[in-house]
Amino acid sequence: MKTLVAAFVLALGFAAVALRAQNEPNLIPDVVDPAKLIPILPEAPTGWTAEKAEGSSDDVGGFKITNVHRDYRKGEAAEAPTAAISILDAVANPDYVEATTGAWNQASETAEGYGKPVTIDGNPGREDYDKERKQASLWVMVAKRYFVEIELQNQEPKELQEWIKRVDLKKLAEIKK
């Protein structure tokens, strides 16, 4: 009988915790609608073409993310310069934000390329360059929620600075929901 009473009390305790958890407010902020981020993706610069911007909100491993993306190309040749800009709203996964940005502080340089921390308009970031593949990438964290990624192919890494200037980081930081 004592075992039955103990099991009953234990079950009531678990039920009470579960009910309390159901009534607690969700403290994880919602990601923004992709339609609010797509206008932040710039138009093609002179001499370039841009594909239609795309975006979606998805549930990834129990966390929601919003991602918008646009591809750019200069010319039709096989080795033509290309660029891709993505904006990822990761506000619902602060552990991912912390782990990713924490790794940006390490600088390295080899004969194959380099990786280094950067600051863009007060925002932390990371720049990487692979010499053999002629591939440059820049990641910038905006408002502790948005990852802006620029990836260039067949361009010099200094071009990353020109591309990031085309993205209105201040306007992006103001978008909350």
What are these regions (language model features)?
Residues 7-15:
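Bacterial N-terminal signal peptides
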Residues 94-99, 136-139, 159-163:
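A short, polar/proline- and glycine-enriched secondary-structure boundary/capping micro-motif
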